[in-house]
Amino acid sequence: MKLSRRQFLQRSTLAGVATVTPTSLWAKNRPSLTIPPMIEVGRGRPVRLDFRPAQTQFNKGKLVDVWGVNGRYLAPTVRVKSGDFVKLTYTNNLPQALSINIQGLQAPTEMIGSIHRAIDKNSSWSPILSVNQSACTAWYHADTMLNSAFQVYRGLAGLWIIEDSESRKASLPNKYGVNDIPLILQDQLINSDGIQVIDTQTNQFFGKRLFVNGQESPYFDVPRGWVRLRIANASLSRHYDLRLDNGKPLYLIATGIGFLADMVEMEHISLAPSERIEVLVDLNEGDKVSLITGKKRDFFDEIGKLFKDNNELNDNVVLEFRPEGLPSALNVTPKLPPFNVEEFNLKITQERKINLRPQDRLINHQRFDPKRIDFTVKKGTVERWYLTTTEEVGFTLQGAKFMVETRNRQAVPHKQLAWRDCVWLEPTQETTLLVKFEHTASEQQPFTFGVSDLMLRDRGCMGQFVVAE
């Protein structure tokens, strides 16, 4: 690679600095990945989720107060089968009111929660959920009006895994915590005492350190073969651009609400705040490899961070895989569940234009008003939404699902068809969605839509809609 004189001088300066910089600055003594405990839901079995203070270590040796569920930082994974009833009990033992949302669960607001269903401190709420949908990876998190970002940042986030009869029969990695790995991504600012720092009065939040399941850029000892990653972006504002640092592909198999027709080979995958994806990685051969966000960094990139004051992460490694055992001669490619393409032959009943101005916290020139219903739709209908934005941002909605039809007037490839509830938007593109409404929401408990950035959402960049019978 040919360097300009300016680049040569910059790198010479950095090289000089490197000789006097402690090795510990770039040495990576990674912690082991923590796997959230699993709550396996049997038919009618009660599930108790106690939201209360907990403790963890962000800086080694410094135990600090955080929030969590059932006594741990972050929340346990809840796994349920489609067709089951779930008797939930949420108990709020935190010092402030709390609302909960299960993003990705397709059900009425009376079941999944809403910003208008607050659980006061020292109180409980016990909904009964009827789970009837295709397999997916959802996440549950604080959704408290004007306060969701702070509460999620403190630790109120976890996964729901919904399975159906077809997903259980598919030849996919399914040993939870072994080759079926949950990854909850959060970027954080941690002070010298090991305490979380956040200014909730800013429009957006970008931390300097990346934590996965509560551990900073960890490693994971994994058996050779195919590995399944269930990745949830629980960061408040940060968007991730995921890839492997050895240049090998990721294989996308599912988005937030369902599977694709077949695994799609991708060099990198975008992940908006609140978005979930499932990907496969082939680790049958080779040495350790890392899942990273952004481009692979070299020595000079690492040292150069000392001179930059921006939103870049100190370490862009999401997870380092350390394969164990011998390669298998029978490393069979996994097969996905059957795909019903007829689900996507949709009859459009109405079209709607939605323009986002995130930094002004406006949608169609209006800021959020908890007393205003922005529109009403009929259950069972499908609408085409035309989305535009003045800045790059994630878009999401509650209680309904959509497929991405076009980006910048170009049809999305058939192989990428899948149901979603979150999508990343670019300011230079118009994105069209086909939105399907299958569950009701009343005026007292409406569904919400808007940006998926929780900071901007708390500051008013969202709206409400009703789904009537």
From Swiss-Prot:
One of the protein's GO biological processes: FtsZ-dependent cytokinesis
Residues annotated as signal peptide: 1-27
PROSITE patterns linked: TAT
Pfam families per the UniProt record, alphabetical: Cu-oxidase_2 (PF07731), Cu-oxidase_3 (PF07732)
The keyword Cell division is assigned to this record: yes
Single GO MF descriptor: copper ion binding
GO cellular component terms, semicolon-separated: cell division site; outer membrane-bounded periplasmic space
Major site of localization recorded for this protein: periplasm
Keywords, alphabetical: Cell cycle, Cell division, Periplasm, Signal
Subcellular localization: Periplasm
Database matches in Gene3D superfamilies: Cupredoxins - blue copper proteins
Role this protein plays: Cell division protein that is required for growth during stress conditions. May be involved in protecting or stabilizing the divisomal assembly under conditions of stress.
Family under the similarity heading: Belongs to the FtsP family.
Protein name: Cell division protein FtsP
Record gene name: ftsP
